[in-house]
Amino acid sequence: MIELKNLSFSYENSSEAKGQLRGIDLHVKKGELVILSGRSGCGKTTLTRILNGLCPGFYPGKLEGGYSLDGEDALKMPIHRLGTMVGSVFQDPRSQFFATNTTDEIVLGMENIPLERPVMQERLNTVCKQMNIERLIDRRIFPLSSGEKQLIAIASVCAMEPKVIVLDEPSANLDSEAARCPIG
């Protein structure tokens, strides 16, 4: 499903080792869960940005090596196509919200795929039930707690049903109960 071969990346105008990846080899099979851990600045976020196409597209730098997704060269995929295959939740969910209402935010990605309204409604209902967040439906996003915003961001990605879900610090804003299993 995901294959990284001798993948290296360094940010443009960066002479520091921080934010650089060198010689990463990784093979992730369908259905497999991989957790990357390491000290701050070791490249975890950079790797997530490569997986979802933000590096080098929006974060310029030098990218070498190979990255394939489902046997296709992900480095040659248009960003919009990669975006339908790789769903991302960032460290700070506020940085990825485009709507002001929770329901609108959860369905936004599905509208852009695009999916038919009945399919979107079914996925919305399913994800909210699985994640036990029905109480957050049809609410304004900005007054929500950081943890509730994190759950909305995760629900939005899950509702799109991408082949790969990349979570960067997924439990950072969640309490211990919600962090145990935000996807039910």
Provide a role label for each language-model segment:
Residues 140-144, 148:
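Conserved ABC ATPase signature
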Residues 37-39:
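The feature captures the beta-strand-to-loop junction immediately N-terminal to the Walker
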Residues 165-168:
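Catalytic Walker B motif of ABC-type/P-loop ATPase nucleotide-binding domains
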